[in-house]
Amino acid sequence: MEIILAEPRGFCAGVKRAVDILAITLEKYKNERQVYVLHEIVHNKYIVEDFKKQGVVFVSSIKEIEDNGGILIFSAHGVSKNIEDEAKRKGIQVIDATCPLVNKVHKEAKRYENSGKELILIGHENHPEVKGIRGRVNNPITLVQTLQDVYDLKVKDPDNLSYVTQTTLSIDDTRDIIAALKLRFPGITGPDLKDICYATQNRQNAVKKLAEIVDMVLVVGSKNSSNSNRLLDLCTARGKRAYLIDNYRCVNKSWFQGVEKIGITAGASAPDILVDELMDYLKVSMNVEVSVMPGGIIENVQFKIPNLV
């Protein structure tokens, strides 16, 4: 049996930055102040549970933190302006681990609003990134999730529209939605696909190629990870069996019956250790040969850690 690894896979620069910020902050203050994270630092069960064991407290609301208490880290997904303001009012020291590419979308949304545009957001309801983007502007943003949403869309002025997008969407689906928006509202302005982050694009392009040359794909990532779910969707859309797994313990050996080539990829919030453990498990469980998919992109993007850390 042959295992082919997607390239690239796993951590993106924004996730690595957020995880590093939390690790450095914890090391610096663990004996002095409680470290909190609003929501999950990234959408990966292993990462969150590991930091919990080290003493990090994950909260769903700033109300759970006492005034002037501890250090609060905003997750990679970003937060609304109201949450920032609430933390200031409570005297909580904040370290912002928002991905710089998400911050870019925040600035775009604000710029469009300041120019008087009615805003449309392409994204997934209730995703923390979407909540953060919506909370960066004063006026309501209309959320579009599907092509049907575009057809049903009602706007104030069809000649005065702009859109932004969540960074972790399906490139193919987003391209179709943008095309539908431009067809229905020819005057609409927006960033094309540029707001879909480089890592999301690279991992989706890689898994498309991977799905063409294997019989089955294992996607390492958590169920609440948007980008991991998109990788799964791309495989199944191409008629390939695919499974989203947190770790090697989720593997069912019956999946491999009749399979000669297994593809493995990992979402942008899945650490290398989970892929390594999966590989070790498969090597012990069955006779496998391992290779890396040819022609993959080697990423070298790095984001700066804030000076406050």
Curated annotation (Swiss-Prot):
GO biological process, one term: terpenoid biosynthetic process
Residues annotated as binding isopentenyl diphosphate: 43, 77, 127, 225-227, 269
Cofactor: [4Fe-4S] cluster
Keywords noted in UniProt: 4Fe-4S, Iron, Iron-sulfur, Isoprene biosynthesis, Metal-binding, Oxidoreductase
Residues that coordinate or bind dimethylallyl diphosphate: 43, 77, 127, 225-227, 269
InterPro entries in the cross-refs: LytB/IspH (IPR003451)
Record CDD domains: lytB_ispH
Gene3D superfamilies reported for this sequence: 3.40.50.11270, 4-hydroxy-3-methylbut-2-enyl diphosphate reductase, catalytic domain
EC assignment: 1.17.7.4
Residues where [4Fe-4S] cluster binds: 12, 99, 197
Active-site residues, record numbering mapped to chain: 129
Residues annotated as binding (2E)-4-hydroxy-3-methylbut-2-enyl diphosphate: 43, 77, 127, 167, 225-227, 269
Class of the enzyme per the UniProt entry, highest EC level: oxidoreductase
Co-factor: note: Binds 1 [4Fe-4S] cluster per subunit.
Pathway assignment: Isoprenoid biosynthesis; dimethylallyl diphosphate biosynthesis; dimethylallyl diphosphate from (2E)-4-hydroxy-3-methylbutenyl diphosphate: step 1/1; Isoprenoid biosynthesis; isopentenyl diphosphate biosynthesis via DXP pathway; isopentenyl diphosphate from 1-deoxy-D-xylulose 5-phosphate: step 6/6
A Pfam match: LYTB
Catalyzed chemical reaction(s): isopentenyl diphosphate + 2 oxidized [2Fe-2S]-[ferredoxin] + H2O = (2E)-4-hydroxy-3-methylbut-2-enyl diphosphate + 2 reduced [2Fe-2S]-[ferredoxin] + 2 H(+); dimethylallyl diphosphate + 2 oxidized [2Fe-2S]-[ferredoxin] + H2O = (2E)-4-hydroxy-3-methylbut-2-enyl diphosphate + 2 reduced [2Fe-2S]-[ferredoxin] + 2 H(+)
GO molecular function: 4 iron, 4 sulfur cluster binding; 4-hydroxy-3-methylbut-2-enyl diphosphate reductase activity; metal ion binding
Family of the protein in this entry: Belongs to the IspH family.
Role according to the record: Catalyzes the conversion of 1-hydroxy-2-methyl-2-(E)-butenyl 4-diphosphate (HMBPP) into a mixture of isopentenyl diphosphate (IPP) and dimethylallyl diphosphate (DMAPP). Acts in the terminal step of the DOXP/MEP pathway for isoprenoid precursor biosynthesis.
Protein known as: 4-hydroxy-3-methylbut-2-enyl diphosphate reductase
Species in which this protein is naturally found: Wolbachia sp. subsp. Drosophila simulans (strain wRi)
The encoding gene: ispH
